[in-house]
Amino acid sequence: MLITTTPFIEGRPVQEYKGAIYAQSILGANVVLDLLAAIRDFIGGHSKSYERVLARAREDAMKNLIKEAEKLGANAILAVDLDYNTVGPQGSMMMVSVSGTAVVL
């Protein structure tokens, strides 16, 4: 599956548009990670714990997006867009939303 953030691929014309596709991944962040992140943010370090959680959520969302494209018979996803949000009580969960256009090249 070819995946790109651009709306087209030079030299690879779109043969068929299959449609817009969407996927999400929501992961909870536990209290210990929140505390460690707050301490690291306070002293100016990076929060590796949050980075790992976000990377996992992004990977899950992308896998789900690929599955949606495959269901439609696409071999590429164009114009991929990722958005990050917090959801739940007091932003206790992280959500990655991803969208794109499923196509046949």
From Swiss-Prot:
InterPro entries according to UniProt: UPF0145_dom_sf, UPF0145_YbjQ-like
Highest rank taxon of the organism: Bacteria
Pfam families: YbjQ_1
Disulfide bonds: none
SUPFAM superfamilies: YbjQ-like
Similarity remark: Belongs to the UPF0145 family.
Protein name: UPF0145 protein CCNA_02462
